[in-house]
Design a protein with these regions (language model features):
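Structural recognition of the beta-strand scaffold that forms the well-ordered cores
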Residues: 18-22, 30, 39-40, 67, ...
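Short helix-loop capping/hinge segments that flank enzyme active sites or metal/cofactor-binding pockets
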Residues: 104-118, 167-192
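A short helix-breaking turn/cap at a secondary-structure junction
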Residues: 42-130
């Protein structure tokens, strides 16, 4: 449940594989990972190549690791990071990426960190609310500062993302179909 990478998340959660690769424009790695109790990482656009991924939004599309443990997700994150001449966004990661992200795992890593939290998202499920409350208490205990984003966020942040997706979708699909050449099932989105 919860997004286009749900199959990948279920496969990891059911121990059918150690790790999987999901794709995300707007929640399709993070939401299924959350729903299936696994780790999902949405890398910055350009850290991983998007070659071969059917596009929805060139400014938001990315692939990312899904795993049962954070360490496994970090290993996969580093294994696939790199420059791809077929994806110009990957040039942005030159000098800003690593082959080993496990080195950044630190049991004291929350100390001094600021973590935003939208309290208005509470109230839909008592058990989930209790788990979130416990997690916030744990993060505070580990030295994190929890910031109530209600006083910062205004409007509807999801709306902007959806507008961008709607704007970029047609051109992205048309370019993807064009790049398929003779193998394309349709010449453009309208024909599709």
């Amino acid at each position: 449940p919860c997004g286009s990478s749900s199959g990948s998340a279920v496969a990891v959660s059911a121990n059918l594989c150690a790790v999987a690769i999901g794709t995300e424009t707007w929640g399709s790695i993070m939401c299924p990972s959350n729903a299936n109790g696994i780790v999902g990482i949405k890398p910055t656009v350009g850290l991983w190549s998007r070659t071969g991924i059917i596009p929805i939004s060139h400014t938001q599309d990315t692939a990312g690791p899904m795993a049962r443990t954070l360490k496994d997700a970090c290993i996969l994150l580093g294994a696939i990071t790199g420059i791809d001449s077929s994806d110009s966004k990957t040039i942005l990661s030159k000098g800003n990426s690593y082959n080993d992200y496990v080195q950044f795992l630190n049991k004291n890593g929350l100390k001094g960190k600021k973590i935003g939290y939208l309290k208005s998202e509470e109230g839909k499920n008592f058990k989930v609310d209790m788990l979130v409350s416990d997690a916030i208490s744990f993060m505070r205990k580990m030295g994190a500062e929890i910031i109530d984003l209600e006083s910062i966020v205004t409007g509807t942040p999801h709306t902007d993302s959806r507008i961008v997706m709607s704007y970029e979708f047609k051109d992205g699909i048309n370019k993807y179909l064009d790049d398929l050449g003779k193998m394309r099932p349709a010449k453009d989105l309208n024909e599709l």
